[in-house]
Amino acid sequence: MAIALYMDVHIPQAVTEQLRRRGVDVLTAIEDGATEVPDDELLERATQLGRVLFTQDIRFRAMAQDWQHQERLFAGLIFGHQLGGTIGQFVKDLELIALASDSDEWRNAVEYIPF
């Protein structure tokens, strides 16, 4: 019943490390060799892997909304505003999301954190 997360290249490593300590399945774009991949390809890659993308890049939010209007499938997007939360808040919210939801709930969904 848990979801897997895919971290955009700009997410602090501390978020990934703390989530892994809590048992959350996390893959970073860096680990996946996707550090210089265009945004649309990164969202597509996360979708191919069945992972919800977490980003702080506002361009992803607009792109995901465009994909929703086009009915183009993606695995889900979680947007964390850079000035809107601390690492601890992001970890807490992402852990809750990852462990309490499933991939079907996230299909073509966009969510904003911190809550």
Predicted regions and their residues:
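Short, surface-exposed connector motifs at secondary-structure boundaries
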Residues: 1, 24-25, 48
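Acidic, PIN/NYN-like endoribonuclease modules and their adjacent C-terminal/linker elements
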Residues: 2-9, 13, 17-21, 34, ...
